[in-house]
Amino acid sequence: EKKPGAPRTFQQDVSLHWRKRDWLLMLGVTLVYAVVALTNLGSMKAPQNPWVSSTRNEQVIIDLGEHHDDVTMLYFCQVSYSNFSVAVSEDGESWSDDYIADMAEGECFQWKYLTPSYMGKDKYGNDKRFFYSQPIKFSARYVRITSQQIGLKMNEAIFQDANGDRIPATVIAQLNVMEESTLYSDANNILDEQDTLEGLPSWWNSTYFDEIYHARTAYEPLHGTAPYETSHPPLGKVIMSLGIAIFGMVPFGWRVTGALAG
């Protein structure tokens, strides 16, 4: 018999006492979240094989097959640190003035149009090139791409006619190359994944907002390069790199782990 004032004793029970209904509710909520989060998360396609410039002034000449009017150019590049230029021609001999293509270091892993640009001053008074958003439309048969750096990594270029249809294109020359360089690559890589652009350039098929930092930083350790973004703790980017390792450097790949982690 328990004495008056004696402390009460309890048998510790650490089990959850979950019943079948509890498990079904949990799994149901998880399934609904997974469907909502993973549906339309991002494209499973993106160009993977780059042409890498082996010299500062390497050039690639592309033939569009015949004369076309109102041509627009899209391109998809990896991490690069300077712009490149594009010129057009009717005969492959006389070339237009160069258009400067935007490829600053934050413009990686996204589809971009070739657009007009102008030189101006930034907020600190330094010279800077500014780019408009409206695509350039040119009339020509031949296109010349010229790198402005060693190591420009262009995964793909697509040319569209006035109706937005892709123009079959062929690389006919690769000039100013250094074949003995470890960076040397076949310029045909620019045109070997034409089916990887789905729709128009958008969040669906490209990096956007902070992804230009975080997706890139998750990709870099997988390839033995120093991480670009170091202002945030690295664990999140390490988790992102798991998705990239499994699904590839595609929008779904760099977003899936964030979606699963909530």
Regions inferred by a protein language model and the residue ranges of each:
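Extracytosolic helix-loop segments that constitute the early lumenal/periplasmic catalytic or substrate-binding loops
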Residues: 68, 179-238, 242
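Aromatic, loop-rich ligand-recognition surfaces of beta-strand-rich domains
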Residues: 38-108, 124-203
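Alpha-helical transmembrane segments
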Residues: 22-36, 187-191
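Lipid-exposed faces of alpha-helical membrane segments in multi-pass integral membrane proteins
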Residues: 28-35, 239, 257-260
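Surface-exposed intrinsically disordered loops and tails
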Residues: 111-126
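Loop-to-helix entry region of an early transmembrane alpha helix in multi-pass inner-membrane enzymes
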Residues: 230-238, 246-262
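Membrane-interfacial, low-structure loops and terminal tails that flank and connect transmembrane helices
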Residues: 1-20, 52
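Membrane-water interface of alpha-helical transmembrane segments
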Residues: 16-27, 251, 255
